[in-house]
Amino acid sequence: MGTGGRRGTRSGKGTEGAAATSSSCLYRCIECNREAQELYRDYSHGVLKITICKSCQKPVDKYIEYDPVIILINAILCKTQAYRHILFNTKINIHGKLCMFCLLCEAYLRWWQLQDSSQSPAPDDVIRYAKEWDFYRMFVIASFEQAAFLTGIFAFLWVQQPMTAKRAPDFVLLLKALLLSSYGKLLLIPAVIWEHDYTPLCLRLIKVFVLTSNFQAVRVTLNTNRRLSLLVVLSGLLLESIVVFFFQRMEWDVSSDCALYKSQDF
């Protein structure tokens, strides 16, 4: 999730160029969330001056001078300022790739748990084909559960928005924020590779971390309070749990490998 230096910012040549920034290209102050026309001004010969927010009188985005590692650490700590920098003041187009990789990680975890709990006397070719098919199946199930989680969030916001008389949230930005904030699922692979007695606990902690990151992404994107953000995430988790229950029943009816869901953490 980290971004580096001045990546994703725009500035004109000199003071006049910076002042002529289009009003449609707005940034956000990472401290007070007010809109800003620019992040810094490039006067000449690389002399830069960070723009001061007119509302809070603090730098609009101090992270444009920070190292990507520092930004990533602050994002891991779920700092609001780091999330605003990443979501509003940078241009990151890895949402789809990151989502796909996270789904592969989750599918691998489920596939690994399934293979670890099942033994078959069938020939090697049959076992190899069955294992490959199981991985594809786990990927599809993980995709459905992820889609259910996102659908639950969007459905709750769609129902709740008319009640609050607020403007409709930017669902595209929220989708990108949720996909980016799910980067914690990448930790599933190290947890499986370096297996030990505390692996089940690690998997649960990863799940909690991902949900916490989703909560912070919702809170920053919608600029709302903690209570509503928590309800939004819980709505997505509820619909995801319903889909998990559906797959449990389906697996129980059509095959005998439903023990996978009993032993897995997600």
UniProtKB/Swiss-Prot annotation:
InterPro entries: Arv1. The chain crosses the membrane at residues 139-159, 173-193, 228-248. It comes from Mus musculus. Keywords: Cholesterol metabolism, Endoplasmic reticulum, Lipid metabolism, Lipid transport, Membrane, Steroid metabolism, Sterol metabolism, Transmembrane, Transmembrane helix, Transport. This is Protein ARV1. Pfam families: Arv1 (PF04161). Disruption phenotype: Mice show an increase in the abundance of type 1 oxidative muscle fibers in the diaphragm. Female mice show also an increase in the abundance of type 1 muscle fibers in the extensor digitorum longus. Conditional knockout in neurons leads to decreased body mass; male show reduced white adipose tissue mass while female show reduced perigonadal fat mass. Show also abnormal circling behavior and severe seizures. It is found in: Endoplasmic reticulum membrane. Ubiquitous. Highly expressed in lung. It is a multi-pass membrane protein. One of its GO terms (biological process) is bile acid metabolic process. The keyword Lyase does not apply. The lineage of its organism: Eukaryota, Metazoa, Chordata, Craniata, Vertebrata. Plays a role as a mediator in the endoplasmic reticulum (ER) cholesterol and bile acid homeostasis. Participates in sterol transport out of the ER and distribution into plasma membranes. One of its GO terms (cellular component) is endoplasmic reticulum membrane. Belongs to the ARV1 family.
